[in-house]
Amino acid sequence: MAIKRRKISVIGSGFTGATTALMVAQKELGDVVLLDIPNMEGPTKGKALDMLESTPVQGVDSTITGTSSYEDTKDSDVVVITAGIARKPGMSRDDLVATNAKIMKSVTKEVVKYSPNSYIIVLTNPADAMTYTVYKESGFPKNRVIGQSGVLDTARFRTFVAQELNVSVEDVTGFVLGGHGDDMVPLIRYSAAGGVPLTKLIAPERIEEIVERTRKGGGEIVGLLGNGSAYYAPAASLTQMVEAILKDKKRIIPTIAYLEGEYGQHDLYLGVPTILGGDGIEKVIELDLTEEEKAQLDKSVQSVRNVMAALPAE
Ligand SMILES: NC(=O)C1=CN([C@@H]2O[C@H](COP(=O)(O)OP(=O)(O)OC[C@H]3O[C@@H](n4cnc5c(N)ncnc54)[C@H](O)[C@@H]3O)[C@@H](O)[C@H]2O)C=CC1
Ligand SMILES: O=C([O-])CC(=O)C(=O)O
C-alpha cells in the first residue's frame, strides 16, 4: 500500500492555532487542516490559503486547508485543540473555565466522531482542567490525551537562564512541574547549563527572580500585548509535541498527563515529566522531590483542583 502523509488538524484558527498550523507545515510533519466555527470560515480559509502559498518559497510539501467542517478533519493522526477564549489583562487563566469547558465538550465530540484513533493535544486554558475535560468527554485512553504547559513554561525558564548566563539556549535544560498557573514549580535541582547545576552558576536570589518571572511568564506577555495572550512560543511548544508523536521521538519533556498515583495524585491531569513518543504519553517519570518541592507541588495541585471544582456539571 502506498505510504500516505500524516494528517494534523488544528481546532481554532486564532493566534495560537494559525501559528501552530504554519510551524507544523514548515517542519513538513504532514498535511494540516485548520478548523474554526462557521462564522470564522472566511478568515480561516484565508489564513490557510495564505500559508499554503508560502510553501513553494519555503520548499515544503505540506498542504494547509481551512474549514469549518469536521468532515475535513477525518482520520487525523494528531488533533491539536486551541479553540476557546483567551484572557485579557487583569484576568487569570482560571476565569476562562466555564466558557472553555463547554467549547472543549463540543469540540471533543466531533474529534472522536471523525478521528477515533487520533492523539489529542490540548492547549486551551485553564490547560490542566481543559485536558481533563477532553479526556473524560473523549473516552480515549489516557496516553492519547495530552496537555501542553511544560514545554512552554520550561522554554521561558530556559530563555531567562540563557540570558542571565549569556550562553546558548540549547545548552540550558530545566523542568517545570505542576499546574499551568502562577504556582507552577520550576525544579532548580534538575536544571543545568551544559550539565553544570544552575546552583553552581547563578546566585540564589537571581534564581528566585528567574523562577518568579517564569511563573508569571504568561501574564507578562498578556500585559504587553494588551488584547490576547502569547502565541509564538505556545505554537512552537505544540509543534515540538506533534513532532515527538509523529516521529516517535520518545522525547523526555513535561506534558500535562493523567495521574493515577504518580506524585501521590489520583484522577488528575497535571504537568509532569513524561516520555512523549509514537504512542503519546508512553511514561510518566517520577522524580524524587525534597520536602520543600513537595510542598510547592501540593500548592500547585490545590490550585488545579480548585479550578476543577469550578468545572460545569455534566
Ligand atoms: N496551555 C498553554 O500553554 C497556552 C494556552 N493558551 C490558550 O489557548 C487558547 C487559544 O488562544 P488564542 O489562539 O490566542 O485565542 P484566539 O482568540 O486568537 O483564538 C481562539 C479561536 O478559537 C475559536 N473557537 C471558539 N470556539 C470554537 C469552537 N467551538 N470550535 C472551533 N473553534 C472555536 C475562535 O473563533 C478563535 O478563532 C486560549 O484559551 C488561551 O488561553 C494560549 C497560550 C498558551
Ligand atoms: O497566559 C496566558 O493566558 C496564555 C498562557 O497560558 C501562556 O502564555 O502561558
UniProtKB/Swiss-Prot annotation:
<keyword id="KW-0520">NAD</keyword>
<dbReference type="InterPro" id="IPR015955">
    <property type="entry name" value="Lactate_DH/Glyco_Ohase_4_C"/>
</dbReference>
<protein>
    <recommendedName>
        <fullName>Malate dehydrogenase</fullName>
        <ecNumber>1.1.1.37</ecNumber>
    </recommendedName>
</protein>
<dbReference type="GO" id="GO:0006089">
    <property type="term" value="P:lactate metabolic process"/>
</dbReference>
<dbReference type="InterPro" id="IPR011275">
    <property type="entry name" value="Malate_DH_type3"/>
</dbReference>
<keyword id="KW-0560">Oxidoreductase</keyword>
<comment type="function">
    <text>Catalyzes the reversible oxidation of malate to oxaloacetate.</text>
</comment>
<dbReference type="InterPro" id="IPR036291">
    <property type="entry name" value="NAD(P)-bd_dom_sf"/>
</dbReference>
<dbReference type="Pfam" id="PF00056">
    <property type="entry name" value="Ldh_1_N"/>
</dbReference>
<feature type="modified residue" description="Phosphoserine">
    <location>
        <position position="149"/>
    </location>
</feature>
<feature type="binding site">
    <location>
        <position position="87"/>
    </location>
    <ligand>
        <name>substrate</name>
    </ligand>
</feature>
<feature type="binding site">
    <location>
        <position position="125"/>
    </location>
    <ligand>
        <name>substrate</name>
    </ligand>
</feature>
<feature type="binding site">
    <location>
        <position position="156"/>
    </location>
    <ligand>
        <name>substrate</name>
    </ligand>
</feature>
<feature type="binding site">
    <location>
        <begin position="123"/>
        <end position="125"/>
    </location>
    <ligand>
        <name>NAD(+)</name>
    </ligand>
</feature>
<dbReference type="GO" id="GO:0004459">
    <property type="term" value="F:L-lactate dehydrogenase activity"/>
</dbReference>
<dbReference type="GO" id="GO:0030060">
    <property type="term" value="F:L-malate dehydrogenase (NAD+) activity"/>
</dbReference>
<feature type="binding site">
    <location>
        <position position="36"/>
    </location>
    <ligand>
        <name>NAD(+)</name>
    </ligand>
</feature>
<keyword id="KW-0597">Phosphoprotein</keyword>
<dbReference type="InterPro" id="IPR022383">
    <property type="entry name" value="Lactate/malate_DH_C"/>
</dbReference>
<dbReference type="GO" id="GO:0006099">
    <property type="term" value="P:tricarboxylic acid cycle"/>
</dbReference>
<feature type="binding site">
    <location>
        <position position="93"/>
    </location>
    <ligand>
        <name>substrate</name>
    </ligand>
</feature>
<dbReference type="InterPro" id="IPR001236">
    <property type="entry name" value="Lactate/malate_DH_N"/>
</dbReference>
<comment type="similarity">
    <text>Belongs to the LDH/MDH superfamily. MDH type 3 family.</text>
</comment>
<dbReference type="InterPro" id="IPR001557">
    <property type="entry name" value="L-lactate/malate_DH"/>
</dbReference>
<dbReference type="Pfam" id="PF02866">
    <property type="entry name" value="Ldh_1_C"/>
</dbReference>
<feature type="binding site">
    <location>
        <position position="100"/>
    </location>
    <ligand>
        <name>NAD(+)</name>
    </ligand>
</feature>
<feature type="binding site">
    <location>
        <begin position="12"/>
        <end position="17"/>
    </location>
    <ligand>
        <name>NAD(+)</name>
    </ligand>
</feature>
<feature type="active site" description="Proton acceptor">
    <location>
        <position position="180"/>
    </location>
</feature>
<keyword id="KW-0816">Tricarboxylic acid cycle</keyword>
